[in-house]
């Protein structure tokens, strides 16, 4: 769990870490090939789409080759994306780790074009499951008597009068959420830091 996952994947796919990280996060959050190329600073191209009856922007040759190499080493990413899409098409929702149902917006017209949000299925599952863990951690912290201040994404902030004691309790509460409640096969690491303010100033 302490490995640099982006470097591990970069080495495995035989590409640089920066594009590996961009692709990892981009695919997890529903980015298509065009947006990935833009994020990587790679050229795109325009091709005519028979299905859409117009020219559309797609990855250029360099971007296509990079994505093809990535997927050749990690075919499960496309499979996972497709599984989430198929689930949304059939049930109209995705289930998180805790079993919550996250519904997706139906296709809608945006600037004269029909847009489907099925590609966001994996993103919903990732972010929704992350929220499950954080919520469980919040409940644990509250029950343990910690003075909760606010949360930022997967970060829980508290006010402490006994730093050493509360650091230990906070770490335990989050560890309980990660390891005991959801029993993840790959454990998540927990970092606890202390500062005079949220910005650390």
Regions found by a protein language model. Name each.
Residues 1-201:
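Conserved catalytic core of nucleotide polymerization and phosphodiester-bond processing enzymes
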């Amino acid at each position: 769990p302490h490995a640099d996952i982006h470097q591990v994947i970069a080495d495995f796919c035989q590409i640089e870490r920066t594009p590996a990280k961009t692709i990892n996060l981009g695919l997890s959050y529903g980015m298509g090939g065009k947006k990935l190329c833009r994020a990587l600073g790679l050229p795109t191209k325009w091709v005519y789409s028979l299905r859409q009856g117009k020219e559309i922007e797609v990855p250029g040759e360099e971007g296509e080759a990079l994505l093809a190499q990535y997927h050749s080493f990690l075919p499960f990413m496309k499979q996972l994306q497709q599984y989430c899409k198929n689930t949304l098409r059939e049930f109209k929702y995705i289930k998180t780790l805790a079993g919550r149902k996250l519904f997706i917006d139906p296709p809608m017209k945006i600037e004269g074009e029909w847009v489907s949000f099925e590609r966001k299925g994996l993103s919903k599952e990732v972010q929704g499951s992350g929220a499950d863990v954080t919520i469980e951690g919040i409940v644990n912290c509250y029950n343990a008597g910690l003075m909760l201040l606010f949360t930022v994404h997967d970060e829980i902030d508290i006010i402490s009068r006994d730093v050493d004691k509360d650091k230990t309790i906070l770490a335990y509460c989050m560890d309980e959420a990660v390891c005991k409640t959801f029993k993840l096969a790959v454990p998540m690491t927990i970092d606890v830091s202390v500062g005079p303010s949220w910005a650390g100033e």
